Amino acid sequence: MHIVLDTNILVSAAWSPGRNASAILEAVFSRKHTPCYDARILAEYDRVLHYPKLKFTEWEINAILEPLVKYGLSVIPEPLLSVPFERDETDRKFYEVAKFCRAVLITGNLAHFPSEPDIMSPADFCRKYL
């Protein structure tokens, strides 16, 4: 199954081993699910994981990003400008990639996205697919 991970899922997985977000990342690393991304998403992952307040080491960041790239699907999605993103326009990229790949979008910020069946919380994804 193709999935798109909002950045908060990566941060949660690194901060909270043994919880839903880390179970999702483990499923990606074991190739049960294929992460989809584009250059904008990778840039955000890299930028956020390097925030000084998160205190992740370069090794930890690489341990997260390298398998995502290695096992993932890099795409160039079509813009979907007809869908409003009033809360956070920067989240549009995740939605565009998810729609392009027909993927499930997993986020801790459901309010930032349209209410659609393939956009779900980590808990809902784990309950349904893991």
What residue spans do the PLM features occupy?
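Hydrophobic "anchor" residues on beta-strands that sit immediately upstream
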Residues: 2
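PIN/NYN-family metal-dependent endoribonuclease catalytic core
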Residues: 5, 15, 21-52
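Residues at secondary-structure transition points
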Residues: 19, 36, 56-59, 85, ...
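Structured helix-beta-strand junction loops
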Residues: 30-32, 71, 101, 116
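Extended, non-globular alpha-helical segments
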Residues: 39-69, 124, 128-130
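Active-site neighborhoods of divalent-metal-dependent phosphate/nucleic-acid chemistry enzymes
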Residues: 70-108
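Acidic, PIN/NYN-like endoribonuclease modules and their adjacent C-terminal/linker elements
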Residues: 102-130
